[in-house]
A protein has these predicted regions:
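Non-catalytic, conserved peripheral segments adjacent to functional cores
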Residues: 1-109, 116-118
Length: 118
């Protein structure tokens, strides 16, 4: 279902498409440089970057990636980012929100191979 309100406006302005894990995205950068893949497969891009949007009520499904992943909250929020380490240890919650006295920050880096959902 298309996003409504400000989220819908951003989907249109940024030319976002539905993301397979939920939300909306568009790749905005793919490095010409490559690096070895951590699991020995062929080389991969040294850096990629996407615009990603979760409208109110949307979720990003549990997933993990082979590289560190940086989240940046640019508008809206707060965003609840759930994390589980590769050994399936303790569940952690990081709240992305504008900087405040409670320690909220608008960005977080999820380490490679950690499970994450938002």
């Amino acid at each position: 279902m298309p996003a409504a309100g400000r989220a819908g406006e951003l989907v249109r302005l940024l030319d976002l498409a539905p993301h397979p894990e939920g939300g909306w995205y568009r790749e905005i950068f793919r490095s010409a440089d490559t690096a070895p893949h951590p699991d020995g497969r062929g080389p991969r891009q040294a850096l990629t970057s996407i615009d990603f949007l979760l409208a109110a009520g949307e979720r990003s499904a549990w997933h993990r990636v082979a590289s560190d992943e940086a989240w940046h909250l640019l508008e809206g929020g707060p965003l609840h980012l759930w994390l589980v380490p590769p050994d399936l240890g303790r569940l952690a919650l990081v709240v992305l929100a504008p900087v405040d006295a409670q320690g909220h920050r608008p960005r977080h880096v999820v380490p490679a191979h950690w499970w994450q959902a938002a």
